[in-house]
Amino acid sequence: MFLKATLLLGLAVLGMHVWAIQMEFVDISKDLDYFVVSVEFAVAWFNSDNTEEQAYKLLEVRRAQQKSWTMIYLMELDLGRTICKKHDEDIDNCPLQESPGERKVNCTFIVDSRPWFTQFTLLNST
């Protein structure tokens, strides 16, 4: 009986370990459609949450990862302050600020994406 209980406990621990490994973030293509939309959401969220008047735009995607078997994306982004205001249109084509106030930031976001519902949730940001 003790041997069976030990074996069962060992299998349960092994199963949890395998499940945890499968739920880790893995590298993905930066061009993956749902990832790109999630990046746009993260940049828009950054601009709306930021107290500055100027808008920031995407400069570079440093890291693109997805949690296995989910639509949860981890992204590390470089953003640059533009000369445009937050609510201006076409911020992507707005020039970067080139003055002593020039500012570039590196941010990490975790976004839960449900694009078929047009629903995105920011789970974490730094």
Curated annotation (Swiss-Prot):
Keywords: Disulfide bond, Glycoprotein, Protease inhibitor, Secreted, Signal, Thiol protease inhibitor
Glycosylation positions in this chain: 106
Disulphide-bonded residues: 84-94
Any GO MF annotation of the entry: cysteine-type endopeptidase inhibitor activity
Chief location: secreted
UniProt cross-references to Gene3D superfamilies, sorted A to Z: 3.10.450.10
Domain of life from the UniProt record: Eukaryota
Keyword Signal (UniProt): yes
CDD domains assigned: CY
InterPro entries noted in UniProt: Cystatin_dom (IPR000010), Cystatin_sf (IPR046350), Cystatin_spermatogenesis (IPR052333)
Record's subcellular location: Secreted
Signal peptide positions on this chain: 1-20
Any Gene Ontology CC annotation: extracellular region
PANTHER family cross-referenced by the UniProt entry: CYSTATIN-12-RELATED, CYSTATIN-16-RELATED
Family classification: Belongs to the cystatin family.
Protein name per UniProt: Probable cystatin-16
The organism of origin for this protein: Bos taurus
